[in-house]
Amino acid sequence: MSIDVDAVSDLIRDVSARVIDPRFRTLDDHQIHQKKPGDFVTDADRQAERELGAAVTKYAGGIVVGEESAFADPTILDAVSDADLAWVIDPIDGTKNFVHGSVDHGVMLAQLNRGETVRGWIWQPQHGHMWFAEHGAGVTCDGDEVTRGDSHSPVRAATTHEVYKIPSPVVEWRMAKWCCAVDYPLVCQDENDVTVYQHSYPWDHLPGALMVREVGGVVRTVEGAEYGPRETSGKLIVAADEEAVSYTHLTLPTNRE
């Protein structure tokens, strides 16, 4: 079937409005859990994943892999690469921010056809922005085309790693937002040139990686491999262009004398 991208956007907004937004800054302690120390999940995450997964499969079919279901059973990721249609969901990206009352959180959804990310959505409910990318068709924010220029000098790079505290003449390090649903758009809209991530889980990165590539950027492991849905453990460099990648590599701890 032909998938109406606006209809999918509406499904995301609907789940957010009913399940996530009413719980923002109103969570009780018993609604907040930790999968491991510092790795938060809330009742809103779990319900939103269930409801969004049910909504997209009712609308278009396919299989669903969500962050919380994959945490419970990592083997479900194996089916994504071979499925004709798969949906990868991060019900609340930036859950730690959400728990602590920060507006920097979002809902992310990727559509994969036989292991290739063909569409990606990022909904930022407290900022009111819907980001969308389609392979070969570019990126939009609230329906408006998104483009960006070459990287800045010095390169504007964000991370949560301690390297952001190290002065560099070629890279201006800053603290990332602890939320891929915010940090990826910051690269797309020319605010940052680079984001370095410590993990590469598909629900965190597939929608944003497509967006960055669609505005001319690159998304690779620090070892140089192109990022894809099978990558689940490596560190990533998300960059506006090759020059930004090169300068960032010079300042990473493994490349410093």
Where are these regions (language model features)?
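Short strand-turn-strand beta-turns centered on an Asx-Gly dipeptide
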Residues: 142-143
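Single conserved hydrophobic/aromatic residue that forms the stacking wall/gate
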Residues: 254-257
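Residue-level signal for inorganic ion chemistry
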Residues: 20, 45, 56, 95, ...
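N-terminal subdomain of lithium-sensitive/metallo-dependent phosphomonoesterases centered on the IMPase/IPPase/PAP
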Residues: 1-92
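DPxDG-like acidic metal-binding loop motif
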Residues: 80-136
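An extended, acidic
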Residues: 148-252
